[in-house]
């Protein structure tokens, strides 16, 4: 049988979906099959961003076989296009590709603009990092976890001058890892039952409406799809891919194999894998074979361009300790005495052999109150297991910092790793205890510690990840009992955006200790600080609580 020549040739019409209905008596001898019916329905095909001419990849072209080494960063970024998505590695200013960022800034907003940048944080309180590109107006959209001390960026967001998609640090890491591994999406416990899940964190703000003091919301946050597995709720996160990744490494050979120093690794490897083109600035460019196979942290297959690092490393927060025996412990202020009391009691939650994560602020003081026979492994979410004390002046290394961007040391047996590995430890419940600060704690164990709408917009950093598995990792809050304005931090119900729902097991303040019933909700007062009575705690607590029959003295 021969088919009619009049049948529509659809091979020359891209973007069509064809629906055919064919019924034919194939044994019939007539030239045209009487019962043959064919029709083509011309439908608008679903938009394919990979084929649509308006969405052709903005990534520079890769030329296989050519040298990966470029003379300088300006040459390497010359063909990056406006509208590109840039994945910028580093943590604070540690491991940030400052040489490449300065080259991008030199392109100017006339030549390079409308960039979307993905980073853990964008700049700092001192010049450096992506702050230069946000201030120049070349970046108009950010995906990050932490604004922190970047007051300029915080102000630009609150004034509606830049779009910011807040995303937990560990989720950004996993979204990048998924993007580089060809996985389109995944489910995570992080952020469930918070504004992150419901899309309640605005991406872009506008000026207040007439007669209102609150900003209008020009772009809402993305609502996450949820699903239950084994009786627990998870939210779906989509992978992140970029056009260009920029990172800094210690040694890079001419084939692109990279070796990083200590905590500079963080987002470098996972961003390089998630980008179409990866540009690395190298402190040392070495011949192929100079880096031992076991020392290659990122393989050359993921690196496309190599430039010499010419901008010196920047140190955000140099924190040191006095040499042994020379600490000045006299004349402590009342505030320091209160903080020490909290830290001393917090140290009792850290048992010998425990793996622990300590949030910034008061939690970091706890190890200094451990007894000599108690040894713990401190994990820092920027990629340390086995974090030590602050360094002496002679020990300061800008490539070894903690989650608060402060200089630290490493103890014998310590290891460093990238952010995907770090948050696998955290989300997977491999940490025994995690200690965090708080803005508010609810009587049911709810925790709020990252935002005061309209006033403070710091970002959640890694906090949402740290509290995402409270059944396996005990969550302890270490905080002063009241805020600076005298308002209660321990409340019946949190009014601030939640970091996690029903996650806190123990609350330690300068006045007392509460144990939290996460399942049924409710607080029990178990310890009182010296000189504090139950009535004082009641006056300064905006939540109902029971008093233990065997209440103890807080030591």
Language model feature labels by segment:
Residues 74-85, 176, 349-354:
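Glycine-rich phosphate/diphosphate-binding loops that line cofactor/substrate pockets in enzymes
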Residues 1-66:
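N-terminal mitochondrial targeting presequence
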């Amino acid at each position: 049988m021969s088919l009619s020549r009049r049948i529509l040739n659809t091979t020359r019409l891209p973007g069509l979906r064809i629906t055919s209905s064919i019924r034919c008596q194939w044994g019939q001898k007539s030239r045209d099959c009487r019962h043959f019916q064919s029709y083509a329905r011309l439908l608008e095909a679903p938009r394919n961003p990979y084929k649509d001419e308006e969405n052709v990849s903005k990534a520079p072209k890769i030329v296989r076989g050519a040298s990966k080494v470029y003379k300088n960063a300006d040459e390497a970024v010359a063909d990056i296009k406006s509208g590109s998505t840039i994945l910028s590695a580093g943590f604070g200013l540690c491991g940030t590709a400052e040489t490449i960022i300065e080259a991008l800034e030199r392109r100017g907003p006339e030549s390079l603009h409308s960039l979307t940048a993905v980073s853990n944080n964008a700049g700092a309180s001192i010049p450096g990092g992506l702050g230069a590109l946000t201030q120049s107006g070349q970046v108009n959209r950010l995906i990050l976890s932490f604004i922190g001390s970047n007051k300029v960026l915080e102000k630009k967001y609150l004034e509606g001058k830049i779009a910011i998609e807040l995303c937990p640090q560990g989720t950004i890491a996993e979204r990048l890892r998924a993007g580089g591994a060809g996985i389109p999406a995944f489910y995570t416990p992080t952020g469930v039952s918070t504004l992150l899940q419901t899309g309640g964190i605005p991406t872009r703000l506008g000026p207040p409406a007439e007669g209102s003091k609150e900003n209008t919301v020009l772009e809402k946050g993305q609502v996450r799809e949820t699903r239950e597995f084994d009786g627990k709720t998870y939210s779906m996160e989509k992978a992140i891919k970029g056009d260009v990744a920029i990172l800094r490494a210690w040694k890079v050979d001419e084939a692109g194999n990279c070796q990083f120093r200590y905590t500079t690794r963080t987002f470098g490897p996972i961003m390089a894998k998630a980008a179409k083109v990866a540009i690395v600035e190298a402190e040392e460019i070495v011949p192929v074979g100079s880096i031992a196979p076991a020392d290659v942290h990122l393989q050359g297959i993921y690196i496309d361009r190599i430039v010499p690092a010419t901008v010196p490393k920047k140190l955000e927060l140099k924190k040191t300790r006095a040499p042994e025996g020379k600490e000045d412990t006299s004349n402590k202020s009342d505030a320091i005495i209160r903080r020490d009391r909290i830290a001393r009691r917090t140290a009792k939650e850290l048992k010998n052999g425990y793996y622990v994560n300590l949030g910034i602020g008061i939690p970091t003081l706890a190890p200094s109150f451990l007894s000599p026979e108690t040894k713990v492994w401190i994990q820092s979410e920027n990629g340390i297991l086995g974090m030590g004390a602050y360094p002496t002046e002679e020990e300061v290394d800008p490539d070894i910092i903690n989650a608060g961007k402060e200089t630290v040391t490493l103890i014998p047996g310590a290891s460093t790793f990238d952010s995907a590995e770090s948050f696998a430890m955290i989300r997977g419940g491999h940490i025994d205890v995690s200690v965090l600060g708080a803005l508010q704690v609810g009587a049911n164990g709810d925790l709020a510690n990252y935002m005061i709408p309209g006033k403070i917009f710091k970002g959640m950093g890694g906090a949402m990840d740290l509290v995402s598995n409270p059944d396996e990792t005990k969550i302890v809050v270490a905080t002063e009992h009241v805020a600076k304005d005298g308002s209660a931090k321990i409340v019946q119900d949190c009014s601030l955006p939640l970091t996690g729902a029903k996650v806190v097991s123990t609350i330690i303040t300068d006045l007392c200790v509460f144990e939290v019933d996460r399942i049924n909700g409710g607080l029990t007062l178990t310890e009182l600080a010296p000189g504090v009575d139950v009535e004082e705690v009641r006056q300064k607590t905006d939540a109902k609580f029971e008093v233990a029959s065997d209440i103890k003295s807080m030591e």
